[in-house]
Amino acid sequence: MEARPCSGVIFTDLDNTLVGPGGEAGEAGEVYLEALDLGYRVVPVTSKSIYEIVELWDSIGVPPGERIALAESGGAIYGPRGSLARPTGFNSEVGLEYTALGKPLASIDALLDSLAETCGAVRLSKADATEAQLITGLPRERAALAARREYLEVIWSRSQECLDTILSTALRYRELTYVHRAPRTVQIAAHRGKGMAIDAALQEPLLRPCAKVVVTAGDSSHDIPIIERGMLAFRVDYNRDWSRLVKPIYMVIPYEAPKAWTMLIETVKTRSNTPSL
Protein backbone atom coordinates (compact mmCIF):
# COMPACT_ATOMS: atom_id res chain seq x y z
CA MET A 1 0.00 0.00 0.00
CA GLU A 2 1.48 3.36 -1.05
CA ALA A 3 1.50 6.16 1.51
CA ARG A 4 -0.49 9.14 0.29
CA PRO A 5 0.84 12.71 0.65
CA CYS A 6 0.63 13.58 4.32
CA SER A 7 0.31 16.89 6.17
CA GLY A 8 1.12 15.31 9.52
CA VAL A 9 -0.04 12.73 12.02
CA ILE A 10 -2.31 13.09 15.04
CA PHE A 11 -1.80 10.59 17.86
CA THR A 12 -4.82 10.86 20.12
CA ASP A 13 -6.27 9.27 23.20
CA LEU A 14 -9.96 8.38 22.83
CA ASP A 15 -11.89 8.34 26.13
CA ASN A 16 -12.50 11.88 27.40
CA THR A 17 -10.30 13.30 24.63
CA LEU A 18 -12.04 12.43 21.36
CA VAL A 19 -15.09 10.61 22.70
CA GLY A 20 -17.29 11.62 25.61
CA PRO A 21 -18.15 9.62 28.74
CA GLY A 22 -20.87 7.74 26.86
CA GLY A 23 -18.38 6.50 24.27
CA GLU A 24 -19.82 8.60 21.43
CA ALA A 25 -17.70 10.78 19.16
CA GLY A 26 -20.51 13.20 18.35
CA GLU A 27 -19.25 16.35 16.65
CA ALA A 28 -15.66 15.09 17.00
CA GLY A 29 -16.47 12.39 14.45
CA GLU A 30 -17.09 14.99 11.77
CA VAL A 31 -13.88 16.76 12.73
CA TYR A 32 -11.98 13.45 12.56
CA LEU A 33 -13.03 13.14 8.91
CA GLU A 34 -12.12 16.79 8.33
CA ALA A 35 -8.61 16.11 9.66
CA LEU A 36 -8.28 13.28 7.13
CA ASP A 37 -9.40 15.63 4.36
CA LEU A 38 -6.71 18.09 5.46
CA GLY A 39 -4.10 15.40 4.83
CA TYR A 40 -3.51 14.28 8.41
CA ARG A 41 -3.42 10.67 9.48
CA VAL A 42 -5.28 10.15 12.74
CA VAL A 43 -3.99 7.37 14.98
CA PRO A 44 -5.90 6.46 18.16
CA VAL A 45 -3.55 5.49 20.99
CA THR A 46 -5.76 3.87 23.58
CA SER A 47 -6.23 1.10 26.10
CA LYS A 48 -9.25 -0.02 24.07
CA SER A 49 -9.25 -3.27 22.12
CA ILE A 50 -9.12 -3.12 18.33
CA TYR A 51 -12.73 -4.30 18.28
CA GLU A 52 -13.84 -1.23 20.24
CA ILE A 53 -11.81 1.03 17.96
CA VAL A 54 -13.35 -0.51 14.84
CA GLU A 55 -16.83 0.06 16.27
CA LEU A 56 -15.92 3.74 16.74
CA TRP A 57 -14.50 3.99 13.21
CA ASP A 58 -17.68 2.43 11.82
CA SER A 59 -19.83 4.96 13.68
CA ILE A 60 -17.76 7.87 12.34
CA GLY A 61 -17.41 6.50 8.82
CA VAL A 62 -13.62 6.35 8.71
CA PRO A 63 -12.55 4.92 5.30
CA PRO A 64 -10.85 1.49 5.38
CA GLY A 65 -7.57 2.92 4.07
CA GLU A 66 -7.37 5.40 6.96
CA ARG A 67 -7.79 2.92 9.79
CA ILE A 68 -4.57 2.98 11.80
CA ALA A 69 -4.43 2.48 15.56
CA LEU A 70 -2.21 1.63 18.51
CA ALA A 71 -4.50 -0.62 20.53
CA GLU A 72 -4.34 -1.84 24.12
CA SER A 73 -1.98 0.91 25.28
CA GLY A 74 0.58 0.11 22.60
CA GLY A 75 0.35 -3.67 22.46
CA ALA A 76 0.02 -3.68 18.67
CA ILE A 77 -0.18 -1.35 15.71
CA TYR A 78 -3.01 -2.03 13.25
CA GLY A 79 -3.26 -0.78 9.69
CA PRO A 80 -4.73 -1.57 6.26
CA ARG A 81 -3.43 -4.63 4.43
CA GLY A 82 -0.02 -3.93 2.91
CA SER A 83 0.63 -0.86 5.08
CA LEU A 84 3.01 -2.28 7.70
CA ALA A 85 6.67 -3.09 7.07
CA ARG A 86 6.79 -6.40 8.98
CA PRO A 87 3.30 -7.45 10.02
CA THR A 88 2.85 -10.18 12.60
CA GLY A 89 -0.41 -11.29 11.03
CA PHE A 90 -3.79 -10.34 9.58
CA ASN A 91 -7.00 -10.06 11.60
CA SER A 92 -9.67 -11.07 9.10
CA GLU A 93 -12.49 -10.10 11.45
CA VAL A 94 -11.54 -6.42 11.41
CA GLY A 95 -9.81 -6.48 8.01
CA LEU A 96 -6.51 -5.12 9.31
CA GLU A 97 -2.97 -6.39 9.52
CA TYR A 98 -1.06 -5.86 12.72
CA THR A 99 2.41 -5.81 14.18
CA ALA A 100 2.71 -6.99 17.78
CA LEU A 101 4.82 -4.63 19.90
CA GLY A 102 5.01 -7.00 22.84
CA LYS A 103 4.00 -10.44 24.01
CA PRO A 104 0.34 -11.52 23.87
CA LEU A 105 -1.57 -12.15 27.08
CA ALA A 106 -1.54 -15.87 26.31
CA SER A 107 2.21 -15.91 27.00
CA ILE A 108 1.74 -14.58 30.56
CA ASP A 109 -1.65 -16.17 31.24
CA ALA A 110 -0.61 -18.24 34.27
CA LEU A 111 1.06 -15.24 35.90
CA LEU A 112 -2.01 -13.06 35.34
CA ASP A 113 -4.21 -15.77 36.84
CA SER A 114 -2.01 -15.94 39.93
CA LEU A 115 -2.17 -12.17 40.38
CA ALA A 116 -5.96 -12.08 40.11
CA GLU A 117 -6.34 -15.05 42.45
CA THR A 118 -4.32 -13.27 45.14
CA CYS A 119 -7.47 -11.61 46.43
CA GLY A 120 -10.35 -12.77 44.28
CA ALA A 121 -10.02 -10.11 41.57
CA VAL A 122 -11.42 -10.45 38.05
CA ARG A 123 -9.53 -10.37 34.75
CA LEU A 124 -11.43 -8.47 32.07
CA SER A 125 -10.21 -10.83 29.36
CA LYS A 126 -11.88 -13.72 31.21
CA ALA A 127 -14.92 -11.85 32.52
CA ASP A 128 -18.46 -12.94 31.77
CA ALA A 129 -20.93 -10.43 30.32
CA THR A 130 -22.11 -9.16 33.71
CA GLU A 131 -18.58 -8.79 35.05
CA ALA A 132 -17.43 -7.03 31.89
CA GLN A 133 -20.22 -4.46 32.29
CA LEU A 134 -19.30 -3.95 35.93
CA ILE A 135 -15.61 -3.49 35.15
CA THR A 136 -16.00 -1.17 32.16
CA GLY A 137 -19.24 0.65 32.95
CA LEU A 138 -20.20 0.17 29.29
CA PRO A 139 -23.41 -1.17 27.75
CA ARG A 140 -23.44 -4.94 27.38
CA GLU A 141 -22.37 -5.12 23.71
CA ARG A 142 -19.54 -2.61 24.13
CA ALA A 143 -18.38 -4.30 27.32
CA ALA A 144 -18.11 -7.55 25.37
CA LEU A 145 -15.85 -5.82 22.82
CA ALA A 146 -13.74 -4.37 25.63
CA ALA A 147 -13.25 -7.86 27.08
CA ARG A 148 -11.71 -9.11 23.83
CA ARG A 149 -8.17 -8.37 24.95
CA GLU A 150 -5.00 -9.70 23.43
CA TYR A 151 -2.16 -7.53 24.77
CA LEU A 152 -3.38 -5.58 27.83
CA GLU A 153 -5.03 -7.16 30.85
CA VAL A 154 -7.33 -5.16 33.10
CA ILE A 155 -7.70 -6.61 36.60
CA TRP A 156 -10.62 -5.33 38.69
CA SER A 157 -11.63 -5.60 42.31
CA ARG A 158 -14.04 -3.77 44.58
CA SER A 159 -11.24 -3.62 47.14
CA GLN A 160 -8.63 -0.90 46.82
CA GLU A 161 -6.39 -2.89 49.15
CA CYS A 162 -6.65 -5.84 46.77
CA LEU A 163 -5.66 -3.68 43.80
CA ASP A 164 -2.72 -2.24 45.73
CA THR A 165 -1.53 -5.76 46.53
CA ILE A 166 -1.80 -6.81 42.88
CA LEU A 167 0.09 -3.68 41.82
CA SER A 168 2.97 -4.21 44.23
CA THR A 169 3.22 -7.90 43.31
CA ALA A 170 3.09 -7.25 39.55
CA LEU A 171 5.92 -4.73 39.79
CA ARG A 172 8.24 -7.50 41.00
CA TYR A 173 8.01 -9.44 37.75
CA ARG A 174 10.51 -8.38 35.10
CA GLU A 175 8.39 -9.78 32.26
CA LEU A 176 5.51 -7.47 33.17
CA THR A 177 6.90 -4.36 31.52
CA TYR A 178 3.70 -2.29 31.62
CA VAL A 179 1.94 -1.96 34.98
CA HIS A 180 -0.43 0.92 35.68
CA ARG A 181 -2.77 1.58 38.58
CA ALA A 182 -6.08 3.18 37.62
CA PRO A 183 -8.74 4.19 40.17
CA ARG A 184 -10.68 0.92 39.83
CA THR A 185 -8.25 -1.42 38.08
CA VAL A 186 -4.66 -2.46 37.51
CA GLN A 187 -3.57 -2.63 33.86
CA ILE A 188 -0.83 -5.13 33.06
CA ALA A 189 0.99 -6.07 29.86
CA ALA A 190 4.24 -7.41 28.44
CA HIS A 191 4.90 -4.45 26.15
CA ARG A 192 6.48 -1.01 26.48
CA GLY A 193 3.46 1.23 26.50
CA LYS A 194 2.05 4.10 24.48
CA GLY A 195 5.17 6.20 24.01
CA MET A 196 7.36 3.43 22.63
CA ALA A 197 4.48 2.36 20.41
CA ILE A 198 4.33 5.85 18.89
CA ASP A 199 8.07 5.73 18.26
CA ALA A 200 7.64 2.40 16.46
CA ALA A 201 4.64 3.62 14.48
CA LEU A 202 6.56 6.62 13.14
CA GLN A 203 9.03 4.21 11.53
CA GLU A 204 6.30 2.54 9.49
CA PRO A 205 6.20 3.48 5.77
CA LEU A 206 2.59 4.56 6.18
CA LEU A 207 3.45 7.20 8.80
CA ARG A 208 7.06 8.10 8.06
CA PRO A 209 6.06 10.82 5.54
CA CYS A 210 3.84 12.35 8.24
CA ALA A 211 6.57 12.73 10.87
CA LYS A 212 7.33 16.32 9.89
CA VAL A 213 4.28 17.39 11.94
CA VAL A 214 3.37 15.28 14.97
CA VAL A 215 0.29 16.36 16.94
CA THR A 216 -0.59 14.63 20.21
CA ALA A 217 -3.51 14.78 22.63
CA GLY A 218 -4.59 13.18 25.89
CA ASP A 219 -6.59 13.86 29.01
CA SER A 220 -4.87 12.05 31.90
CA SER A 221 -1.47 11.35 33.40
CA HIS A 222 -1.55 7.94 31.68
CA ASP A 223 -1.41 9.88 28.40
CA ILE A 224 1.81 11.70 29.24
CA PRO A 225 3.85 9.38 26.95
CA ILE A 226 1.54 10.44 24.10
CA ILE A 227 1.55 14.16 24.87
CA GLU A 228 5.31 14.45 25.31
CA ARG A 229 5.96 13.20 21.78
CA GLY A 230 4.05 15.99 20.10
CA MET A 231 5.49 18.97 18.27
CA LEU A 232 2.06 20.43 18.88
CA ALA A 233 0.77 18.82 22.07
CA PHE A 234 -2.67 19.18 23.62
CA ARG A 235 -3.72 18.57 27.19
CA VAL A 236 -7.46 18.16 27.70
CA ASP A 237 -7.67 19.63 31.16
CA TYR A 238 -10.43 19.43 33.72
CA ASN A 239 -9.07 18.93 37.22
CA ARG A 240 -6.53 16.27 36.23
CA ASP A 241 -3.24 15.48 37.93
CA TRP A 242 -0.42 16.60 35.63
CA SER A 243 2.38 16.64 38.19
CA ARG A 244 4.36 14.00 36.23
CA LEU A 245 4.25 15.89 32.94
CA VAL A 246 7.89 16.58 32.15
CA LYS A 247 7.61 18.34 28.81
CA PRO A 248 6.45 21.91 29.48
CA ILE A 249 5.36 22.70 25.91
CA TYR A 250 1.70 21.95 25.37
CA MET A 251 -1.62 23.68 24.81
CA VAL A 252 -4.46 23.35 27.29
CA ILE A 253 -7.96 22.65 26.01
CA PRO A 254 -10.43 23.76 28.70
CA TYR A 255 -13.32 21.64 27.37
CA GLU A 256 -14.49 18.09 27.76
CA ALA A 257 -14.81 15.66 24.86
CA PRO A 258 -16.02 15.72 22.17
CA LYS A 259 -15.82 19.54 22.03
CA ALA A 260 -12.17 19.29 23.08
CA TRP A 261 -11.23 17.51 19.87
CA THR A 262 -13.10 20.05 17.77
CA MET A 263 -10.99 22.80 19.33
CA LEU A 264 -7.86 20.72 18.72
CA ILE A 265 -8.45 20.53 14.98
CA GLU A 266 -9.34 24.21 14.76
CA THR A 267 -6.03 25.02 16.45
CA VAL A 268 -4.12 22.65 14.15
CA LYS A 269 -5.69 24.33 11.11
CA THR A 270 -4.65 27.76 12.39
CA ARG A 271 -1.14 26.73 13.37
CA SER A 272 -0.54 24.84 10.13
CA ASN A 273 -0.63 28.17 8.31
CA THR A 274 2.31 29.48 10.34
CA PRO A 275 6.02 28.92 9.53
CA SER A 276 6.65 27.48 13.03
CA LEU A 277 4.58 24.41 12.22
Curated annotation (Swiss-Prot):
Pathway assignment: Carbohydrate biosynthesis; 2-(alpha-D-mannosyl)-D-glycerate biosynthesis; 2-(alpha-D-mannosyl)-D-glycerate from GDP-alpha-D-mannose (MPG route): step 2/2
Location in the cell: Cytoplasm
Residue positions binding Mg(2+): 13, 15, 219
Keywords (A to Z) from UniProt: Cytoplasm, Hydrolase, Magnesium, Metal-binding
Positions of transmembrane segments: none
Reaction(s) this enzyme catalyzes, per UniProt: 2-O-(alpha-D-mannosyl)-3-phosphoglycerate + H2O = (2R)-2-O-(alpha-D-mannosyl)-glycerate + phosphate
GO molecular function, one term: mannosyl-3-phosphoglycerate phosphatase activity
Active site positions: 13
Cofactor section: Mg(2+)
Its EC number(s): 3.1.3.70
Family stated for the protein in its record: Belongs to the HAD-like hydrolase superfamily. MPGP family.
General function of this protein: Hydrolyzes mannosyl-3-phosphoglycerate (MPG) to form the osmolyte mannosylglycerate (MG).
NCBIfam families in alphabetical order: HAD-SF-IIB, HAD-SF-IIB-MPGP, osmo_MPG_phos
Protein name (record): Mannosyl-3-phosphoglycerate phosphatase
